[in-house]
Design a protein with these regions (language model features):
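Generic structural signal for alpha-helix starts
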Residues: 35-36, 177, 304, 308
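Short, flexible helix-adjacent loops and helix caps
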Residues: 161-162, 259, 291, 295-298, ...
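Membrane-interfacial helix termini and the short, flexible loops that connect transmembrane helices
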Residues: 218, 257, 262-265, 297-304
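Short, mixed-charge aromatic SLiMs
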Residues: 215-223, 274-275, 301-312
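Alpha-helical recognition segments enriched in aromatics with Gly/Pro capping
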Residues: 59-61, 69, 88-92, 96, ...
Length: 328
């Protein structure tokens, strides 16, 4: 909006990333980046200057910070599981700080959807839970939520409900670290970073081995697309007008995957006319006369050794590519 942003200090919870900065840099050096310059430059420079991660967000929808603090601020509890939370609630009831357990009926250890449908771990429920400190003082949850980027960074383990289920998937490295991920170059401060930080801090490991950092799709003048500037291209209108094939071919033939693309619909029209138009005319010519002559392809397949050098070369290139993809 180009409006000035007002900053003011708030109490927040941080992850002390700066203590592990050297480890973050060391693990990054083991990652195969495409292009390499993104890993060493943009992402590497970001790690070199990494600050502590502000985890607190003052919102309603999201994952609540599982932190309870006594009224005088002298005691803190961090809850690590539903099982622990239920135990703490029962203790709070015993101490007279709560009347009942809202998770009554939940079966600890039962990982079925039906069982988890019995509880709600979001803010409007969790904020009503009052725990007891070791000295029986009332403890209330921190009102903030967790940064949503922490959710995405925890994806490799959260998707398997680790460590409560499927521990072997992660501990035995069956599904972690990832062999390959891909995202836009802007994720050097987003998903690439949060995956990397959590993997390093929690598992002392990379979260991914190989990464392709895609370039951004810009307008035809090289400016970032924006509704405010009115230079955004509607992808659905583009696909309806030119079709998906011409659009795909234009995008993959005009820049490397890791370079930014200056997107111009006039270029799609040119691709459709010159490439797909020519291809269509060739096929139409063949189809017309093949049907007139009732052509049938019953010719015997020529053995590889009997083919010309150019045929053998292109077949070899194809099978080399197939092998490299399968072995990757």
């Amino acid at each position: 909006t180009d409006k000035p942003v007002l900053y003011y200090p708030l109490n927040s919870w941080f992850i002390k990333v700066t203590e592990k900065r050297n480890e973050l840099i060391a693990f990054n050096n083991k990652i195969n980046w495409k292009p390499k310059s993104t890993g060493e430059g943009r992402f590497g420079n970001w790690l070199n200057n990494a600050n502590d991660w502000n985890l607190s967000r003052s919102r309603f929808w999201g994952i609540p910070l599982p932190i309870w603090i006594s009224e005088d601020g002298s005691e803190t509890k961090v809850i690590g599981s539903v099982k622990q939370l239920i135990e703490e609630i029962n203790q709070s009831i015993e101490d007279g700080n709560m009347d009942s357990n809202p998770f009554q009926g939940f079966e600890v250890g039962n990982m079925s959807n039906e069982n988890y449908d019995k509880i709600d771990l979001h803010k409007h429920t969790i904020d009503d839970i009052v725990l007891s400190s070791s000295s029986k003082k009332k403890m209330y949850r921190e009102s903030d939520l967790i940064d949503v980027w922490f959710d995405s960074g925890a994806m490799p383990y959260a998707q398997w409900h680790y460590p409560f289920e499927n521990k072997n998937y992660i501990d035995e490295k069956k599904f972690f670290p990832a062999d390959y991920i891909a995202e836009g170059v802007d994720q050097t401060r987003g998903w690439f970073y949060t995956l990397h930080v959590i993997g390093t801090l929690v598992f002392n490991s990379n979260s991914y081995k190989n990464v392709i950092s895609n370039g951004l799709v810009l307008d035809k003048n090289g400016q970032k697309m924006s509704k405010r500037l009115g230079n955004a291209v509607d992808p659905f209108e583009t696909l309806d007008r030119f079709g998906p094939d011409a659009t795909r071919w234009y995008m993959i033939s005009n820049s490397n995957p890791w370079d930014n693309l200056k997107f111009d619909v006039a270029g799609i029209e040119e691709v459709r006319r010159k490439f797909f138009g020519t291809l269509h005319n060739i096929y139409s010519f063949f189809s017309l006369y093949a049907n007139v002559d009732k052509f049938k392809n019953h010719e015997k397949i020529i053995e590889y050794k009997d083919r010309c050098e150019l045929d053998r070369w292109i077949i070899s290139e194809l099978n080399t590519l197939i092998k490299e993809v399968k072995d990757a």
